[in-house]
Amino acid sequence: DGPLIIFVHGWPELAISWRHQLPCFGSLGFRVIAPDLRGYGGSTVYDRHEDYALENVVADMIGLLEALGANKAIWVGHDWGSPVVWSIASHHPDRCHGVANLCVPYYTLDRGLDACVGLINRDIYPKDEYPLGQWEYQGFYEENFAAAIAPFDANPFNAIKALFRGGDPASKGKPSRTAYVRRDGGWFRGAAEPPDVPRDDKVISEIDLFAYADALSRNGFFGPSSFYMNHETNATYADRAVNSGVLEIPVLFIAAEYDFTCECIDSRLTEPMREHCTDLTSKVVQSGHWMAQEKPAEVNAALAQWLATSLPDVWPK
């Protein structure tokens, strides 16, 4: 019965992505919930790209909130879960005590791919070589969706091992591997299926690996990857945000120092967020993209400190 925190996962994850956060904040007295988003795990799989537009996913989350008998929640997102949470905050601020997001800053992917392109670090991604910068892979989804998802569907087990890797400081200042997807004609240098690489036990256990792979084998990658197919629709939806998109609720953003796709340290990617949040707290965790799983103690500490200082009235009594 404590204050409600809803954790929203990203691509290609599940509710178990928050397995290190749920017991932590539950033990502090919060009521903690982590759903599988539409297309994932035990949730409904829809068969049209447009079914995965942010407006529809936000409606799911508001429906979940109401089904839980709550008027407001603290919302926490990661990866595609971040645009979902940002959209809840910008369209339904009355449903938010506050919001926290990992890796993907506000006023970027929640407003479509074009909102990100103008913020690319062209020192790393010259425009003539990487027109979409680190977001080249998203352009490939739009141009050849079937080819984009084929290797993942061919071997979800290997896909999870290849994707869920810890941060690599040596890659700083170099193009992200996502920048080569369009040039290579697909993920994994255009291979028919992902390489068989060792599991990175700093990020996922063997049990986690099988849970992810089993769910993605059942449902396939059509639904999860359809999140990349609604940029124009999402931009139109974002234009209808209340208060001109300015967030006046408490906001926490946690950047991953070694996430070189959502690169927030040496780029302009966070500038629009800073201009559109009146109560923003920013933190940096030394991790790769999967920070809630790679560095759970640091993520939990950042979340707990923000909750205690920015939302003291919501802290469990």
Where in this protein do the model-derived segments appear?
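Conserved residues in the N-terminal Rossmann fold of short-chain dehydrogenase/reductase
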Residues: 34, 255, 284
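Flexible "cap/lid" subdomain of the alpha/beta-hydrolase fold that forms the substrate-access gate
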Residues: 4, 40-72, 76, 80-280
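Catalytic active-site module of serine/aspartate enzymes centered on a nucleophile-bearing elbow/loop
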Residues: 277-317
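Signature tryptophan residues that serve as conserved aromatic anchors
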Residues: 11, 15-18, 80, 86, ...
